[in-house]
């Protein structure tokens, strides 16, 4: 069912049924069976003081274009780093939803996450081994990285900077634990939103002699534990509000396409091109596919799945096709079905460069045409209606970003 077909300004509850086979026997599980409706892992909001208010399933609502007197209450966030300082601000959204579960005039209508849902270029040292192993487990095979003469499991925590700078031609100065394989990118998304995907224990670092490195590692563990405690709340938020996401640079790598020189240098590196493609494929799977699934053709999906389904043995042609397809795909801009309509623009892959090292224009002519085309495809948009524009990269005061 298309999201726009749901009734507007009406509280909607839902359940999910997962079907699978054990041998020839088909089995099904729902949210209750998965332990997601009770206890610490519950993704529902309850009012313990008034039984009439209790809703025993996750809920959401859709604000519509005919609700002219109904507010569009937007929650907005960006730049969420698991080892960042302080508390996870995304948890604030949980309190806002909990305070207005059935009051749709006050309850947040949508959540906009407008860049850097992960920091691929600056993963935490205590997590990197787990991300590598978890990523391999997810795929069922260990991805071969062109130009890397060793396995990712053979690279220690904090030891990736040289590969990133010299071989991938990236400019991140914090790339000691830069994500590389598709599996690592996928694992990073899965631990960012679900506590059950975390390691039971963090890898010891007692073998490191340098006190400064040890201290940094221990600080990162404390920061990660703080983020970890907020994850049940984060999952509940995402289960109870329509959420739309767009990338900026850190979802792929710091300084992504910041200048023509950067773009051309990385294009000349098979290693760098493969990492960017892996990041884009993971962005599609974990962020933007849910924004508007109709944007992605069977050809696009096949281009990704053919590579990932090769069980660790993709041939050179399959890998090249995967990388080239993602590097030459530019239809990331999309419209969120709000009123006014919201256009999320891709301000990274359709830039215009007037010089080798100078700041770019955020959008080239094709990018501007994409915005126009995307807007007029919205069936309830009429010329002259207001539009919300979401740009992950700053529009005003923009220089090199």
Question: Which residues are covered by each model-predicted region?
Answer:
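Metal-dependent phosphoester/phosphodiester hydrolase catalytic core
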Residues: 1-401
């Amino acid at each position: 069912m298309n999201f726009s077909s749901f009734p507007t300004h009406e509280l909607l509850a839902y359940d999910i049924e997962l079907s699978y086979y054990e041998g020839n026997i088909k089995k099904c599980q729902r949210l209750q069976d998965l332990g997601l409706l009770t206890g610490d892992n519950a993704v529902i909001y309850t009012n313990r003081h008034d039984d009439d208010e209790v809703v025993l399933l996750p809920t959401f609502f859709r604000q519509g274009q005919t609700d002219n007197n109904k507010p569009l209450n937007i929650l907005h966030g960006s730049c969420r780093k698991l080892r960042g300082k302080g508390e996870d601000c995304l948890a604030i959204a949980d309190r806002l939803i909990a305070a207005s579960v059935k009051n749709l005039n006050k309850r947040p209508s949508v959540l906009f996450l407008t860049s850097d849902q992960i920091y691929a270029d600056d993963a935490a040292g205590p997590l990197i081994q787990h991300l590598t192993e978890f990523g391999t487990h997810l795929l069922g095979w260990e991805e071969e990285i062109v130009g890397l003469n060793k396995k990712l499991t053979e690279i220690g925590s904090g030891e990736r900077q040289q590969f990133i700078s010299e071989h991938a031609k990236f400019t991140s100065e914090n790339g000691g634990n830069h994500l590389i394989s598709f599996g690592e990118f996928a694992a990073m998304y899965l631990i960012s939103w679900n506590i059950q995907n975390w390691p039971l224990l963090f890898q010891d670092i007692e073998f490191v002699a340098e006190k400064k490195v040890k201290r940094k590692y221990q600080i990162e563990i404390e920061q990660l534990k703080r983020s970890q405690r907020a994850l049940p709340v984060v999952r509940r938020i995402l289960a109870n509000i329509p959420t739309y996401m767009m990338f900026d640079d850190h979802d792929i790598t710091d300084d992504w396409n910041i200048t023509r020189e950067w773009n051309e240098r990385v294009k000349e590196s098979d290693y760098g091109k493969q990492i960017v493609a892996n990041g884009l494929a993971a962005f599609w799977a974990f962020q933007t596919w849910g924004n508007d699934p109709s944007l992605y053709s069977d050809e696009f999906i096949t281009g990704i799945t053919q590579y990932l389904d090769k069980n660790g043995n993709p041939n050179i042609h399959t890998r090249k096709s995967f990388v080239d397809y993602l590097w030459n795909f530019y239809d990331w801009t999309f419209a969120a079905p709000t009123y006014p309509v919201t256009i999320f623009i891709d301000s990274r892959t359709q830039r215009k460069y007037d010089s080798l090292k100078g700041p770019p224009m955020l959008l080239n002519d094709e990018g501007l045409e994409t915005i126009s085309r995307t807007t007029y495809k919205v069936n309830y948009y009429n010329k002259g209606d207001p539009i919300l524009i979401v740009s992950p990269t700053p529009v005003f005061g923009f220089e090199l970003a």
